[in-house]
Amino acid sequence: MILMPMASVVAVAEPKWVSVWGRFLWMALLSMALGSLLALLLPLGVVEEHCLAVLRGFHLLRSKLDRAQPVVPKCTSLCTELSVSSRDAGLLTVKTTASPAGKLEAKAALNQALEMKRQGKRGKAHKLFLHALKMDPGFVDALNEFGIFSEEDKDIIQADYLYTRALTISPFHEKALVNRDRTLPLVEEIDQRYFSVIDSKVKKVMSIPKGSSALRRVMEETYYHHIYHTVAIEGNTLTLSEIRHILETRYAVPGKSLEEQNEVIGMHAAMKYINTTLVSRIGSVTMDDMLEIHRRVLGYVDPVEAGRFRRTQVLVGHHIPPHPRDVEKQMQEFTQWLNSEDAMNLHPVEFAALAHYKLVYIHPFIDGNGRTSRLLMNLILMQAGYPPITIRKEQRSEYYHVLEVANEGDVRPFIRFIAKCTEVTLDTLLLATTEYSVALPEAQPNHSGFKETLPVRP
């Protein structure tokens, strides 16, 4: 959508300048301008209260201006707030075009944030930085200044993300370039240290005796939990106990969608195929392997489309995947990368995360792309000696957020998200196999009728 200058928007919205609405609008504009000027003349102790009044005034003005704007459809699940750190999770947005009023409000908020920062009122400044970026997510100066603010708070990863986002929008922004050059090596060191922590926990898991009954119990429970969460992320409403019932008895759950139950059976078939065929196989991962995984994932729901590339264009949130005629070529290139020396030299968690992202970016299938991508990710982890990980349904928003950020040009938050999931899985295994073990929810320690577990390789 092409945005007109504010004066143009106002003129189109109300050509009768003598109307009550027109007079009110210009009075509001004038009051905002005078109010901002007054802020410079007021004693410093009054600025904090004034900035809040200014923001309230902008909210009123924005509500009037928005009446002149075209109605924009609400974003899909992928167009949501972005989690960049635990402190500011869900407070920054991506892929949103600011209105003229929003940009004006963002500039006012940034100026007030810098003033609050100068006064040492960092809590107020923090909220104003976030407000500025909420109003205008592409405000490069606000991204850069918030990055500096985050650095001062020792949040190097968030600062580096903000500089990177600023440079994605404006590649030659001098201040962001200088700041990013400073934070990039620090962030790389932090990421490598985190990988080392994960590696040390993998070694502890590998030291658990192969015959450990506690390990077997938790892996069986993890199997059910993985199926439950991976289909729940896609909207499946079956409960964990219902999924256990389906897989253990092979009987349908009365009153529940047969399609949802077939999704569970398909996931079970795909995981069984991976466990018995691919995990221990020596050699490269082929395109046929991925097609076979997908054939099982979707085979009980849509056997016609299972195991074949899509033939229609799809839209995933803001992301437009490759045209159907380009899918096979991109999958060939993806397969070459999967088996390349560059990929093999990556840390296993980074390799698995990138493989997941690349496959879901291509979106080669009409349905089942997310489930297939997560299975491929776990295949790579297991081949490297790691346990399979679970992305829980409660993490759905964060999961989609970091995928959206990757689509915007920074895949590192997604890699860190997968690393976090890996660490949680390792901690669960270590906790469950200690003397004071804690079972997973709805676990049944004495259950032994289910044999197809996802193995932890010795």
UniProtKB/Swiss-Prot annotation:
Descriptive protein name: Protein adenylyltransferase FICD
GO biological process, one term: regulation of IRE1-mediated unfolded protein response
Gene Ontology CC: endoplasmic reticulum; endoplasmic reticulum membrane
Positions annotated as glycosylated: 275
Activity modulation comment: The side chain of Glu-234 determines which of the two opposing activities (AMPylase or de-AMPylase) will take place. In response to endoplasmic reticulum stress, mediates de-AMPylase activity. Adenylyltransferase activity is inhibited by the inhibitory helix present at the N-terminus: Glu-234 binds ATP and competes with ATP-binding at Arg-374, thereby preventing adenylyltransferase activity. In unstressed cells, disengagement of Glu-234 promotes adenylyltransferase activity.
Cofactor(s) needed: Mg(2+); Mn(2+)
Alphabetized InterPro entries for the sequence: Fido, Fido-like_dom_sf, Fido_containing, TPR-like_helical_dom_sf
A Gene Ontology molecular function term of the record: Hsp70 protein binding
UniProt keyword Zinc-finger, yes or no: no
Fido domain boundaries: 285-420
Reactions catalysed: L-tyrosyl-[protein] + ATP = O-(5'-adenylyl)-L-tyrosyl-[protein] + diphosphate; 3-O-(5'-adenylyl)-L-threonyl-[protein] + H2O = L-threonyl-[protein] + AMP + H(+); L-threonyl-[protein] + ATP = 3-O-(5'-adenylyl)-L-threonyl-[protein] + diphosphate
Family named by the database record: Belongs to the fic family.
E.C. code: 2.7.7.108, 3.1.4.-
Location(s) in or outside the cell: Endoplasmic reticulum membrane
Topological region Lumenal: 45-458
Cytoplasmic side: 1-23
Cofactor: binding comment: Divalent metal cation. Prefers Mn(2+) over Mg(2+).
Membrane topology (UniProt): Single-pass type II membrane protein
PTMs per UniProt: Auto-AMPylated in vitro.
Subunit details: Homodimer. Interacts with HD.
Domain comment quoted from the record: The fido domain mediates the adenylyltransferase activity.
